[in-house]
Amino acid sequence: MFKIVSTSFFFLLNSFLFSQTGNVDENFKKIYNTALTKGKTYEWLEHLSNQIGGRLSGSFNAQRAVEWAREELDLLGLDSVWLQPVMVPKWVRGTFEYASIESSPGNTINVPICALGGSVATPSSGISANVIEVKDFEELERLGTNKIQGKIVFFNRPMRPDLINTFESYSKAVNQRFNGAEKAAKFGASAVIVRSMNLRLDDYPHTGSMSYGNLKLRERIPAAAISTNGAELLSSMLSLNPNLKFFLKQNCKNYPDVLSYNVIGEIRGTKDPDEVILVGGHLDSWDLGDGAHDDGAGIVQSMEVLRIFKKLKFKPKKTIRAVFFMNEENGLRGALAYANHVKKINEEHLFALESDAGGFSPRGFSFDCKSRDFKKIISWKKYFEPYMVDYFVQGGSGADIGPLKNGQVVLAGLRPDSQRYFEYHHSDNDTFEAINKRELELGAAAMTALIYLVDTFGFE
């Protein structure tokens, strides 16, 4: 009798699991078909990029982006749409920067540069000084004040081309951009120039955030990025003439903080509405280019997750919430404000997924979670394999959802192909024309599919 019951139970269990798998496969097809044949990501991104454009925190365009995002979320017929106030820094680039290499009196070559975000201006007449090239902070320390005083420090450590994951290459080079001015100022440098964070040789300078640490205002020095071609030229000319001079002029300025907003919309859960599944990206971008890949793509992909749920009449168990964070690029104020509010009201977040790596072909996801949860997640990989989204790795998520980390919530990041990303990142190159419609849509579909699985199965 026991054997018959056991056999029957095993048969029913297998039938149930097969039924679940069949439903998942069918719903994945519906999700992908909707994203690829009736998607809105490309249309949305065209407006955000071409009609609004670069949207640095505190700017008029950033406010326009907030209003646009709220209106589009309202049109989706969500259960709730609201703005979360947040004070953000305001930095203005001013007129375009100018730089030149002077090999001898009267002989100059112009090179492409851009001020780093948060940098102070040069004097109105600019700065002209000798240049000292370094690869890292250790070399800077060895040279000391005697050799650096009054000179322009040129940080010229390239991103490593031998690393397959270009974000790893970026992480090993970006400290010279972020901390270079602070380090060089302590040795009396008059300014810093940093090689752009770009694996390709081209004429586009790439901006990005930087910090002066605890330096007093009078101790701060101008900081600018030089294009990779410009860096190669300057380095080769220095090897021939160490006494050449570099001229730099920029009139950027920091202003007092201003009011801005995170934009939030959600579909309330039917069973556990107090448990939140978050999907999002950052609404702000740098002022160069249109911010199409960074991070307009993540914004419209997150919007598409909600739209597909509504279109397919999926009734989520948990609350599915999209958050468009403000000020990721130069402060993370939006992320911190959101996380602090969540903590204050003791709101439970089950899962958070961020898209902030460009609108390229999705390859998979990274997960910041416990091994127990990752074991469950890895069992879902089979559903993604037919769509060639099979890179599942434990470790890492996203900057804006990072402050939510509490040991319980599972954090994740969409991982698209990264090989071209840093050609566009933080530069005039990051425009709508650099977006591939199908790749953008595939990313949105993969995100929607993962959110669907988390809502359907959870992590228990």
Show which residues each predicted segment covers:
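Noncatalytic luminal/extracellular "stalk/propeptide" segments of secretory-pathway proteins
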Residues: 46, 50-164
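Active-site-adjacent substrate-binding region
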Residues: 185, 191, 195-196, 216, ...
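N-terminal capping segment at the start of a domain
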Residues: 23-59, 96, 204-208, 212, ...
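A conserved hydrophobic secondary-structure block that centers on an alpha-helix together
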Residues: 136-147, 151-199
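Acidic/histidine-rich catalytic neighborhood of metal-dependent amide-processing enzymes
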Residues: 179, 259-262, 285-377, 459
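Soluble metallo-hydrolase cores and metallopeptidase-like ectodomains found primarily
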Residues: 25-27, 102-105, 113-145, 212-292, ...
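Bacterial Sec-dependent N-terminal signal peptides
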Residues: 1-23
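Second-shell loop/turn segments in exported
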Residues: 28-36, 50-60, 97, 118, ...
